[in-house]
């Protein structure tokens, strides 16, 4: 077997084929709204973060599952164009995950999505070297069993694990103890520990699962993190917004740039 080159980050998680539909405003119930255009683009939570890391100069690998439809070809072509080492497992007779995304004139998006259960990535479809020949692992936890297996291998190899968690998927409790950097949406810490105050729930989350850092993204308010010694709050940049689709994914890519794995990559380059 040919040994894989070491990459700076490997992502295991969702991809999706997004149809972006700009509209002047979100439709009221029972109304009709003319849309400006409809653009089909590859996206997805982990896939987008990996692509951003690649475009910012990191060496990247992506592992995920697609159908056997034209959308899968779009993803393969885009990963290849950008230089991402992609391992795309095909689900026969199945459509790739798709999303229809309404984006209003203020840039806020509303996502309608569909994912066939046959797109679930299974642990036995992973190869250990995809994970261990890297300096960092990024997961979203959607296909929980596969994420747990990948995180186990990463931890055993001393590789930091970063998670983008926006929902409490079944079995997620098995993943949480194997995370170094847990970054969630605003509501997740409270749902996990039963405390809505982030200045209490983030430390409780870190203590319970042993993460190096816990953080919650706050949309236009920024992000709040707890590293075990102090809180770190960073406000969001104030920009003229065109489209918020993928904003969180890009934030996670930015965070990956500053993990210890990134520091090691910088010093060894």
Describe the residue ranges of each PLM region:
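Conserved phosphate-binding/catalytic loop of the ribokinase/pfkB sugar-kinase fold
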Residues: 87-91, 101-141
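Active-site-proximal loop->helix
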Residues: 70-82, 101-102, 107, 175
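A glycine-rich helix N-cap at a beta->alpha junction
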Residues: 78-93
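Conserved phosphate/ATP/ADP-binding segment of small-molecule kinases
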Residues: 151-233, 240
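Glycine-rich phosphate/adenosyl-contacting loop at the front of the ribokinase-like
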Residues: 1-65, 72-74, 240-242
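Conserved phosphate-binding/catalytic region of the ribokinase-like
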Residues: 1-8, 34, 198-269
């Amino acid at each position: 077997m040919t040994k894989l080159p070491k990459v700076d980050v490997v992502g295991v998680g969702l991809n999706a084929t997004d149809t972006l539909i700009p509209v002047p405003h979100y439709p009221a119930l029972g109304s009709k709204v003319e849309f400006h255009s409809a653009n089909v683009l590859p996206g997805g939570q982990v896939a987008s973060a990996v692509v951003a890391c690649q475009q910012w100069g990191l060496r990247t690998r992506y592992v995920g599952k697609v159908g056997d439809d034209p959308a899968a070809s779009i993803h393969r072509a885009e990963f290849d164009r950008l230089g991402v080492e992609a391992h795309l497992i095909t689900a026969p007779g199945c459509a790739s995950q798709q999303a229809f995304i309404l984006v209003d004139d203020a840039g806020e998006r509303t996502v309608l999505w569909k994912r066939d259960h046959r797109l679930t990535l299974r642990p036995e479809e992973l190869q250990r070297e995809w994970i261990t020949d890297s300096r960092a692992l990024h997961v979203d936890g959607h296909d929980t069993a596969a994420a747990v297996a990948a995180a186990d291998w990463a931890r055993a190899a001393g590789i930091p694990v970063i998670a983008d968690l926006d929902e409490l998927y079944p079995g997620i409790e098995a993943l949480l103890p194997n995370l170094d950097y847990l970054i969630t949406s605003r509501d997740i810490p409270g749902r996990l520990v039963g405390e809505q105050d982030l200045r209490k729930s983030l430390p409780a989350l870190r203590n319970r699962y042993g993460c190096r850092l816990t953080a919650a993204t706050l949309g236009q308010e920024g992000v709040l993190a707890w590293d075990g010694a102090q809180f770190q709050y960073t406000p969001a940049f104030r920009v003229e917004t065109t489209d918020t689709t993928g904003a969180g994914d890009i934030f996670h890519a930015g965070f990956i740039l500053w993990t210890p794995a990134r520091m090691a990559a910088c010093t060894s380059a």
